A protein has these predicted regions:
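Short, surface-exposed coil-to-beta transition loops
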Residues: 4-6, 66-70, 92-96
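Beta-strand/loop substructures that line and gate deep hydrophobic ligand-binding cavities in soluble
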Residues: 86-137
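Beta-strand elements of well-folded, non-transmembrane domains
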Residues: 11-13, 59-63, 75, 90, ...
Length: 157
């Protein structure tokens, strides 16, 4: 079964700052929980993403067991959106659409992840027992880190 995870977060910065941060693969380790041991393995010439870009990672999502993960950037609309698609990794399907909407308060970040686990019924069981909760925790951690990075000096309304 295909699942969808959607998150929004308003950050207090300009579109160029948001794009530069989120489109740089090396920043993923900053917004991923430390216990996942997320490491970008691809040596990147610079931080500019492009369609067709392949990025290799190592991550330990469960029981501290390292797994290889490879994504391809399948779509880029400069300073508006990009999509990463898992080519190799733990999911049967992983498609993450990142959208950036400039507004009077800075930038609204929208994440839409479409994903499916392998192994049919067993994958669905794993999803209901721990995978969904783990993904929500990862995006919750990310939200907290981004609040500190971008919104700590925001004036209360």
């Amino acid at each position: 079964m295909v699942h969808r995870l959607y998150r929004e977060q308003q950050i207090n910065c300009d579109i160029d700052t948001a794009w530069k941060f989120f489109s740089a693969a090396n920043n993923l380790s900053v917004i991923t929980p430390p216990e996942m041991n997320f490491i970008v393995r691809t040596k990147l010439e610079n931080d500019e993403i492009f369609e067709g870009m392949i990025i290799d990672y190592t991550v330990s999502p469960l029981l501290n067991i390292p797994m290889k993960w490879q994504t391809e950037i399948t779509q880029v609309d400069l300073r508006k959106s990009f999509t990463d698609f898992q080519k190799k990794g733990p999911y049967k399907l992983w498609n993450h659409f990142h959208e950036f909407v400039e507004n009077e308060n800075g930038v609204l970040i929208k994440d839409t992840v479409t994903y499916e686990l392998p192994m049919g019924f067993l994958g669905e069981l794993a999803h209901s027992l721990f995978v969904k909760k783990k993904l929500e925790g990862i995006f919750g951690f990310r939200h907290q880190v981004l609040e500190v990075m971008f919104n700590k000096n925001k004036k209360a309304s």
